[in-house]
Amino acid sequence: MTTPQIPPEESLIEYPCDFPIKVMGPHTEVYIEEIVALVVTHAPGFDAAQALVRRPSSTGKYIGLTFTVRAHSREQLDNIYRAVTGHPHTKYVL
């Protein structure tokens, strides 16, 4: 599947920019490590120590992860979204 091309003058996002991606899944270290690895694959400069916020659910069963990545193109963002959405344990991606 290809990403439709949007002319730069029609895009609402100016690249490069810092872009937050929110992911929700099970509250396990394995899941978090796997999602971080997927993000790093498409955003090699991503530093989880400084650009990852973790928010556990009230029951502790799930965790919300906010990754702030330095996005250089729509294609890069689409690739990150596809990767984290494709993880079998991911519940939501915003």
Task: List where the protein language model places each region.
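Long, contiguous binding/interaction regions
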Residues: 1-64, 68-94
